[in-house]
Regions:
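Non-catalytic interaction-recognition regions
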Residues: 41-45, 49, 63, 132, ...
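Short catalytic/ligand-binding loop motif for oxyanion handling, primarily in non-cytosolic enzymes
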Residues: 35-36, 72-75, 135-138
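Short, solvent-exposed loop/turn segments at secondary-structure boundaries
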Residues: 39-42, 77
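Non-catalytic terminal extensions that flank enzyme cores
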Residues: 1-39, 50-66, 86, 90, ...
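Active-site neighborhoods of enzyme catalytic cores
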Residues: 92-157
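Charged, often glycine-rich, active-site loop that binds/positions anionic groups
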Residues: 71-88, 142-143
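Short, solvent-exposed turn/loop segments enriched in Gly/Ser/Thr/Pro and often Arg
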Residues: 65-74, 130
Length: 157
């Protein structure tokens, strides 16, 4: 395991960084904040952070993004969530009210404490919420482009 001045670089992360072409790079991780966020979700971020640190150690420009899929629908009722929340099944997590009233939405109820944990761990990551990206029109151009090239995309996929 090599390291930069403050971050150890696991060997596998260095291999990943070495396999990438020249930057700039964007490393994206993410989850759907539909229930209590756990150590498995944290692993998602820490794997990305290891690759980011390996790229930085090589002098590469890199942007680290955590994508919170807040537009995902509520698919099931998480432990501790009132049973009457079944009425919100199928609704966007960003539009379901917070059951305790302490956050703006169901998604934020679970995402907020996770973001705080990342801050306390000094993980430097840009958190993006999918519902905000959609509402801002961020995906409009790429969606148009994808629709114009569906045949080519089918061949690739």
């Amino acid at each position: 395991m090599s390291s930069t001045s403050s971050h150890p670089i696991p060997g596998w992360a260095a291999v990943v960084a070495d396999s990438l072409g020249p930057g700039p790079h964007v490393v994206v991780t993410g989850i759907s904040p539909s229930g209590n966020i756990h150590v498995g979700n944290l692993r998602e971020v820490l794997v990305g952070e290891a690759v980011v640190n390996a790229l930085k150690a090589k002098g590469e420009a890199v942007r680290f993004v955590f994508h919170a899929d807040t537009i995902d629908p509520l698919r099931k009722i998480a432990p501790g969530v009132p049973k009457d929340y079944e009425r919100y099944l199928g609704h966007s997590l960003s539009r379901v009210p917070d059951m305790e009233g302490c956050h703006d939405s169901y998604a934020e109820h679970f995402l907020g404490p996770f973001e705080e944990a990342l801050r306390r761990m000094e993980v430097e990551v840009e958190v993006l919420r999918s519902h905000e990206l959609y509402e801002s029109g961020f995906y409009a151009e790429v969606t148009r482009e994808a629709l114009e090239h569906t045949g080519e995309l089918r061949e690739i996929l």
